[in-house]
Amino acid sequence: GGEIADIVMVHTGLSTEVLKESISQIRDGEAIAGKTAGATQVWAFAKCNISDDRDEAIDEIKMALAASGHHAFRFTLDGKHVPEELRESIAILQREYLPVEHEQLGHTRNAALSDELNLTDYLADRFAVVGTPDECREKVRSIEAAGVDMLLITAIGPNPSEIIRRFGEEVIGPTK
């Protein structure tokens, strides 16, 4: 990434460990190309939902969490910081994920998979900025502290414009 790009979009996960690993690989690419360290902007991509109730916020985006898990772990789990105890569940997600239902809102098979496989909390923590305004602010701060230059969110839920409004007013505004 860093050897050829000016900006790299990262969707490998939002934990500090995963972000630092991704950024390290980008910086290695910069060094190979003779670029100044930090010349490549790092953007992170996150599924987002905000609510006064964390469980409600997560419930509304389970299908998107399953989609992120399906995408990120499609070819291998090697080097992807997946806990050993979740590897079999991730393998089942890969086999049973239904592309025809990709990110459809509501009670879909893909939404149910994350709960059935006990992956919901892991996928939410890894791929989303989701929960109460306080929880979302904390997550945004940790993403920034890991070295990310820009956070791109996709508002997922029954009312995306309300998610964007609340995110701007209750998460981004207070973090400045």
What annotation goes with each model-predicted range?
Residues 19-29, 160-176:
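C-terminal helical cap(s) of enzyme catalytic domains, especially alpha/beta-barrels
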Residues 2-30:
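Loop-centered beta-sheet repeat module
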